[in-house]
Amino acid sequence: MFNRFKRALIGRPLTNKAIKNEKYGVIWGLPILSSDAISSVAYAGEEILLVLLPAIGFMAYKNLLYISAAIISLLLILTFSYIQTIENYPNGGGAYIVASDNLGKIAGVVAGAALSVDYILTVAVSVSSGVDQITSAFLFLRPYSILICIAIVLILMIGNLRGIRESSRIFGVPTYAFVFGIVAMLIAGIVKIKGGYVPPTTPLKAVEPVTLFLLLRAFSNGCSALTGVEAVSNAVPNFKEPSVKRAITVLILLSSIVLISFGGISVLISMYHITAGDKAVIIQLANEIFGRGFMFYYITATTFIILVMASNTAYSGFPLLLAIMAKEGHMPRQLNKRGDRLSYSNGIILLSVLATVLIVAFRANVTSLIGLYAIGVFISFTLSQTGMAKRWITTRSKNWFIKAIINGTGAIVTAIVVIIVGITKFREGAWIVIIVIPVLVFMMLKINKHYRAVAVQLRVSPEDLQCIKISENHYRNRVIVPIESINKASIRALRYARTISEHVIAFNVSIDEESGEKIKKRYAMLNTDIPLIVKYSPFRRIVEPLLKFIESEEYNYKKGDMITVILPQFVVRKRWHNILHNKTRVYIEKELLKHKHIVVATMPLQLHDDDDIEDKCKKEQ
């Protein structure tokens, strides 16, 4: 039943050969990878105003344009840098691969950890922001914000579990719809002003002077418009061939849309003197330009959808990033395994769970989540820019000096943003990210250390392979079958034990002499020459008496012998039946596996369905 439900939810399994059909081109690659960056324009200008308006009043609008121009300049630098990254690192991984290759393993892990945190926050911020936009238009939905967010994350998870191709179709159309709405609003807004419309003005007084630190704070807030630019470089392997060419085309289109949308909205905010308040800035603009007509609701709906879809960029990048890191040994190997629909399903589920935890913990509050946002992605920006600058200096390829200057400038600017965000948003939540990233780096390095240690212990050199003779009897095998009672499962285990060794014993641990005598009498009825050893354990311990017996002279165990412990097991038909039976076998297996001379095997006995047995009993009566 579970499998049928799973198939209905995410579709039938796909073969490995179908992976080529799961890749996307420019038309669908653009919306699925650009939704994060494009959606940022819906709130980036608002984040700048939240810093400037309370401090310098009406002067905020003029400074908003200057700050927007600076952010657009940084966008162009990042675009150039990531084009070079795509050309030089076509296997994906973005900042993680660039930093690892040029700055060393630790720098790469820091970039990977920072980018992972940013992807998780992208889902939490985008979904919360989208719900905030829709509840700004429909206030009666405000009390249900958290539940709506959780439902949306669940839908996103299911959509992405269905595979890359299907998710690109599902989540692609809203991006184009949003871009159309924004362009229409930009044109209509400018035409309306040129036609003589005078927007209402709210008196706003400055309460403090324009300082460099104030402008830097506003700049760092507005840099949220740049989040998502790195997504294309992380997902190059998801493109159809020629993947590099298609990825670069998507990146250029993405940057062009962000430039026009973000720059245009900043101009409209200044023209219409929009304030940052209870209602989202983009909703206020739509209301001012179109009134409460069709286009107002169109902008509201597409803004909500694009903000939600922005998180789909994370669903494209996060699982792939973790898969690459898992392949390198910095994350659990399970994250490098594709699911039934050829998506990295474990990464998708992990992202959904972590994003949901954040949404619930911060009660879907965008302002609180924004405090954590951006610092992670700008750390990865800085490391990526620094890595590319070093690459040009090292390789000295064509135009290397100009490229190094551009990347070096980008590295300095993004590093400044990291410092500003870290300082200005420390109390707002940035401290959490500042702590979490080093913890993640430590965890990833420990994981890598473990995998390397395992590899060293398992490695067999070609020279050793030629000397090993598996045909020889390397071990003398002795078998022990622990039995709790004499039943079909234990008898089946004893029969199997006899087929693999002549040295077999049955072993029972009883809590008192009375129960021990009972099992001895019942075992005596069994037609077998396998001896039964009964040990008493008044403290109800099970494994200790068995291990003590193995090491005793009574057992006559010799160094070099291998002991196979066969555990009888019955397998129930329904999963919930498992909770009705104790897990003694699991505990015994766990403890015995700590000893290198002991092999643990299970002998299963499949039980029939309860209803079938009940019907059989009724017939026999």
Question: Predicted regions span which residues?
Answer:
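Membrane-interface "cap" regions at the ends of multi-pass membrane proteins
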Residues: M1-A55, F80, N91, A99-I106, ...
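Hydrophobic alpha-helical segments and their helix-loop junctions in multi-pass secondary transporters
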Residues: A177-P203, I265-Y272, T382-S397, K446-A455
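Loop-to-transmembrane helix boundary motifs in multi-pass membrane proteins
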Residues: K105, S145-I150, K240-I260, A326-V360, ...
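Extracellular/periplasmic helix-exit of transmembrane alpha-helices
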Residues: I190-G196, I248-Q284
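Extracellular loop-to-transmembrane helix junctions
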Residues: N3, I48-S100, K105-G112, V125-I152, ...
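Helix-loop-helix junctions that connect adjacent transmembrane segments
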Residues: Y176, G181-T227, T424, E428, ...
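Cytosolic C-terminal regulatory domains/tails of membrane transporters and channels
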Residues: M1-N16, A453, V460-Q621
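C-terminal membrane-solvent junction of multi-pass transporters and transport-like membrane proteins
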Residues: Q334-S345, F381-F426, Q457, Q466-I468
